[in-house]
Swiss-Prot record:
InterPro entries, per database record: ARM-type_fold (IPR016024), TRPC4AP (IPR022162)
Pathway(s) it belongs to: Protein modification; protein ubiquitination
GO biological process assignments: calcium ion transmembrane transport; hair follicle maturation; protein ubiquitination; ubiquitin-dependent protein catabolic process; ubiquitin-dependent protein catabolic process via the C-end degron rule pathway
PANTHER family from the UniProt entry: SHORT TRANSIENT RECEPTOR POTENTIAL CHANNEL 4-ASSOCIATED PROTEIN, TRANSIENT RECEPTOR POTENTIAL CHANNEL 4-ASSOCIATED PROTEIN TCPC4AP
Region (Interaction with TNFRSF1A): 2-400
Name of the protein: Short transient receptor potential channel 4-associated protein
Location in the cell: Cytoplasm, Perinuclear region
Pfam family, one: DUF3689
Complexes and interactors: Component of the DCX(TRPC4AP) E3 ubiquitin ligase complex, at least composed of CUL4A, DDB1, TRPC4AP/TRUSS and RBX1. Interacts with MYC. Constitutively associated with TNFRSF1A. Directly interacts with TRADD, TRAF2, CHUK, IKBKB and IKBKG. Interacts with TRPC1, TRPC4 and TRPC5.
Main localization, broad class: cytoplasm
GO cellular component, one term: plasma membrane
Amino acid sequence: MAAAPVAAGSGAGRGRRSAATVAAWGGWGGRPRPGNILLQLRQGQLTGRGLVRAVQFTETFLTERDKQSKWSGIPQLLLKLHTTSHLHSDFVECQNILKEISPLLSMEAMAFVTEERKLTQETTYPNTYIFDLFGGVDLLVEILMRPTISIRGQKLKISDEMSKDCLSILYNTCVCTEGVTKRLAEKNDFVIFLFTLMTSKKTFLQTATLIEDILGVKKEMIRLDEVPNLSSLVSNFDQQQLANFCRILAVTISEMDTGNDDKHTLLAKNAQQKKSLSLGPSAAEINQAALLSIPGFVERLCKLATRKVSESTGTASFLQELEEWYTWLDNALVLDALMRVANEESEHNQASIVFPPPGASEENGLPHTSARTQLPQSMKIMHEIMYKLEVLYVLCVLLMGRQRNQVHRMIAEFKLIPGLNNLFDKLIWRKHSASALVLHGHNQNCDCSPDITLKIQFLRLLQSFSDHHENKYLLLNNQELNELSAISLKANIPEVEAVLNTDRSLVCDGKRGLLTRLLQVMKKEPAESSFRFWQARAVESFLRGTTSYADQMFLLKRGLLEHILYCIVDSECKSRDVLQSYFDLLGELMKFNVDAFKRFNKYINTDAKFQVFLKQINSSLVDSNMLVRCVTLSLDRFENQVDMKVAEVLSECRLLAYISQVPTQMSFLFRLINIIHVQTLTQENVSCLNTSLVILMLARRKERLPLYLRLLQRMEHSKKYPGFLLNNFHNLLRFWQQHYLHKDKDSTCLENSSCISFSYWKETVSILLNPDRQSPSALVSYIEEPYMDIDRDFTEE
């Protein structure tokens, strides 16, 4: 329940299994002897031939060998289990044997997960390894799937208790023995069958955790539309089950290759998209559609995401779930952390948790809520945080999917945004307590901490929600919407249509909207905080799209520009990611806004400060080029306006004066083209290409395009590499045509952000790529024949 969304699907032990295998095989003290029984079993497991199961040996033989090898009697138990689990068995004896096997594996797995990998001196091999080698995993799969077999028209049944034992043993083996999870993942019919076991509350948690671990290593994504009665299954989940189910959904609705989306080359992504078009919707897209077709699914997620701590499940129910965790190892670390929190707070609050003894039956229930079973408040909060992590992740992925507009409508209708606003101070951005939950092996500032992960997931959701969508105004309250209208009225400009169309019953309530709350915590964030990047991205997404003067002024009035400049100039920020996000935000905030440039000049009021600012810009144009683009566009607009206020800013602003110089523009242009190549273009650095195009489009408007190309040629020659820059630019523009002429969304974004029609973008690129060497605006006119290299094939190898 508490896994970070960015790592959804990763099992507790998966990253450590190689160590267990080393420990197991190292027990021979060298290369195994020919004829060694374990080696033969291992070969049989790999080939499917020869020795593969305990049933192929006599009990006498296994007992004798066990005395020498100390296998804890596991092979003999598997032999008995096979005998007592036939189709006509009543499974009573079978269940008794499972209860003998379970503790032999569970303690070993618990030690493995908690990194206390101390194999007892009596055993040479881990019990889980022996269990798997003698066919235990395959046998349990068969037992679990017996209900799918019909005899004389009647389906077999096994008890929930027996299913729980089988699932626990399977999971423990997956944790400790390398390769078991992958083998289970290859059994697609078994994976689909596991979903049916989630219909029972008694087996839900074990099943969900095993499925999550299996899906995390499955090469091909499972299709949810193959799960029998998916809609009924999900609709019958209670809220706790639905929150846990979101862990599985995180693996099934996310595209498998999106981990480092900005780092993948556009060539590779374009090739993948072409391939995808021929194959139809991806499994992730099919799964998203399947979920959205379930009645009430998104509404329930919104309720879970916005549920207050006081509304969450009662203590007894939570205790029961924790008892499950006690033997369910994927959550052992979380349980360990929760118990530490409880112990710390009990010293101050005299409140503690009392678990029933391990053997207590479910029928007897758990102790009633009393002074001894009251949960500390911080524990309740952590419980809720771990749920919300998964839910917010799923909502975020759905918001970025093909059905984005449908999801947007539902999220707005079910009041997700005002609900999150009400939770902001008490849960999402609450102050850290001394006993804030910290996972085993991590510290309080680690990005794996549930507290921190929730904040990042929340910010990612806001970014996805606001990005190029009119619903972004739901982040404000009624008073703030009125403020936007007043700003437009005072400036004598039309009100933003989206503001007028906003349903006031769906906006935030209270004294401050969600955007204002975000600005407040953003300005208080420490310089080294990892949240700065995500906060800036979330606020920038509110400004993206067609530039809105009212939106900019709303943020300027709250001191956002001064905060950004402080971070860039005065805080000595070193993080490239944070600087890039702040440069991007500053560009959107200042674009075409005279008041913003006045505020900039007021803050950057000395040459020393301005030089620090320029140093930050010039240190990495990949990070700062969006700001360069916005200032260049603003300068062009201001120069064409007849207004005293604009004229005053043009004459006083250091930044505008700096950008207006042709040598400055040429320096930026040369470096922007030089730092990118077709083979290295990514979603992150393709903006450098578009910024260079903006500079040349504005030059073309002023009939200065030939001058700029001639200057680029001279700069090339001064570097003693004639043709290297213009050939590269020619190839980049050829790729630009291939990439953008088939991308409706991307082209719309270019048009909206620059206020230059996309047709003008296309015309300018065509003019630059004109093959006529007599054209003064064609790149080939400035590349000398011996250095011409413009027909390079940039197909992804």
